[in-house]
Design a protein with these regions (language model features):
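Conserved small/polar residues in nucleotide/adenosyl-binding loops
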Residues: 185-187
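Active-site metal-coordination segments of metallo-dependent hydrolases
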Residues: 158-166
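Substrate-binding/catalytic groove segments of enzymes
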Residues: 147, 178-183
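Metal-dependent nuclease catalytic cores that hydrolyze phosphodiester bonds in DNA/RNA
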Residues: 1-132
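An active-site-proximal "capping" alpha-helix that borders the catalytic cofactor pocket
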Residues: 165-175
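Conserved catalytic cores of phosphodiester-cleaving nucleases, focusing on short active-site segments
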Residues: 78, 133-157, 171-172
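Active-site catalytic microenvironments for nucleophilic, acid-base chemistry
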Residues: 83-87, 174-179
Length: 187
């Protein structure tokens, strides 16, 4: 796996507007809402209700702990993978760090090892004037230019529960196509 300078991804920064994540992107005049913000704001009521039911079932304090631990684990997993791609090694010996490392190694074994070229790490993608986001990796995966986003989970998820992941990747693919003229159908 080698890093190849094939595309020039813009610099960006994140900002909150009315409590929602937006991006400032070089070359864009206005703040662009993040893909995840748009998906969160357009979530079906049933999905919002099921999350609230879960919070009530486990209790607010436990729900906050589970959410916080998942965020810590996800951040540690991403750091491990990004460092690995850049040829560095990171070691987090905290209990959540050890879990994150195990999750990251599964991603390496089941997918990252099949990436031959890396075009972008934590790359900003934006659809001019509409939205922006940051994907974890743009790489040649099994000989196809692909957008890759690392996801961590505590339990296996059913396909219908992760529809937002597919919508997020489709939005990133459309953004890449709009800016670089390359249709990415492998997400």
């Amino acid at each position: 796996m080698k890093i190849v300078d094939k595309y020039t991804y813009p610099r960006s920064s994140r900002a909150k507007l009315a409590g929602l994540r937006h991006y400032t992107v070089d070359g864009e005049e206005k703040l662009l809402p993040s893909v995840t913000t748009i998906l969160g704001q357009t979530q079906p009521k049933e999905k919002q209700d099921s999350l609230e039911k879960w919070r009530q079932k486990v209790g607010l304090r436990e729900a906050q702990k589970i959410t916080r631990d998942a965020a810590i684990r996800g951040t540690a997993m991403h750091k491990y993978l990004e460092d690995l791609i850049r040829g560095q090694r990171s070691l987090d010996l905290t209990p959540l760090g050890v879990e994150a490392t195990r999750m990251a190694e599964i991603i390496v074994d089941r997918g990252l090892n099949d990436c031959s070229e890396i075009y972008g790490i934590e790359a900003t993608l934006y659809y001019p004037g509409l939205y922006a986001g940051s994907c974890d990796l743009i790489a040649k995966y099994k000989d196809k230019v692909s957008i890759i986003d690392f996801k961590q989970t505590n339990k296996p998820k059913q396909r219908e529960w992760i529809e937002d992941y597919f919508l997020q990747m489709a939005a990133y693919g459309m953004a890449h196509d709009a800016v670089y003229g390359l249709s990415l159908i492998h997400i």
